[in-house]
Amino acid sequence: MTEKVTHVHHWNDNLFSFRTTRDPGYRFKNGHFTMIGLPNDERPLMRAYSITSSNHEPELEFFSIKVQDGALTSKLQNLKVGDEVLVGKRSTGTLVPDNMLPGRFLYLLATGTGLAPFMSIIKDPEIYDQFE
């Protein structure tokens, strides 16, 4: 499905994020990833990206590193508000709250784009019911 870019933020020389519109029927679990690509005249190049936004948010958000010679990231880092992005129709993944055992504490350690699924999870108020 095609979504429109609503916001782009360059955090530093190596990391940026972007938000897109979200089809009201698009469902995912916090911590899931989906395929992202850019429209073109040929078959689009798609890559897996963790969803940074929580499943209750009205937009989709993604983190990406900047790779100058990357087949997709070299183009994604030049996104502007209003550009179109292809988003896979399905999401998947195992780093989801349903797979986390309840306990006293929840530790989530990551850097860079590895933060994306964790940010999706910590924005979910229900995750805090599983931990003290």
Which residues are covered by each model-predicted region?
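Ferredoxin-reductase
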Residues: 1-81
